[in-house]
């Protein structure tokens, strides 16, 4: 694309959702509500990472990797220490929710780095991921809240605020889309 044309996230998010759908094959993802949560679980970090490349933000990319690494490592350590049984009884690795930690790391990064116009939809998507884990009996509500709080705290610590002007929430025929502008 040449000239001041916009690159919208609608195409990007459609691609990410399609790729992510392939990851939602877990045995417990047996209904559409849970499957949608699985799609968003993978789409959020892919979206955050893609934004750092598309917006040519190498500092943000490094901060995303650090925040994700610290959040997930801490979550794994806590799982081993707490050993809380899942609501469905499958194992004792319920606390904290890695899914919530992953989704909320992405959302917190997007909000902190690119502002609330991009962050609010990301937080809504992350909240849906958390809700879907409680709905599917994979986690207790407190597991999800702990994963979300950990992710938010680590992101506040490691992610520097960036320019918020590159993102916008725009109406579409089917609802809303997250968009950003890149000039070539």
Q: What is each model feature region?
A:
Residues 51-71:
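Interfacial segments of alpha-helical transmembrane regions
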């Amino acid at each position: 694309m040449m000239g001041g044309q916009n690159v919208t996230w609608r195409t990007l998010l459609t691609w990410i959702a399609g790729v992510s759908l392939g990851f939602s094959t877990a045995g417990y993802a047996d209904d559409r509500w849970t499957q949608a949560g699985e799609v968003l679980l993978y789409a959020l970090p892919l979206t955050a990472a893609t934004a750092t490349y598309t917006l040519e933000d190498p500092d943000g990319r490094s901060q995303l990797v650090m925040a994700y690494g610290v959040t997930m490592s801490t979550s794994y350590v806590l799982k081993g220490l707490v050993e809380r049984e899942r609501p469905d009884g499958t194992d004792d690795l319920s606390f904290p929710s890695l899914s919530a930690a992953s989704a909320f790391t992405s959302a917190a990064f997007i909000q902190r780095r690119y502002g609330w116009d991009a962050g609010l939809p990301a937080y809504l998507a992350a909240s849906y991921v958390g809700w879907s884990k409680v709905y599917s009996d994979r986690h207790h509500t407190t597991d999800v809240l702990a994963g979300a709080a950990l992710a938010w705290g680590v992101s506040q610590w490691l992610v520097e605020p960036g320019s918020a002007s590159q993102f916008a929430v725009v109406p579409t025929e089917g609802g809303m889309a997250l968009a950003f502008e890149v000039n070539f």
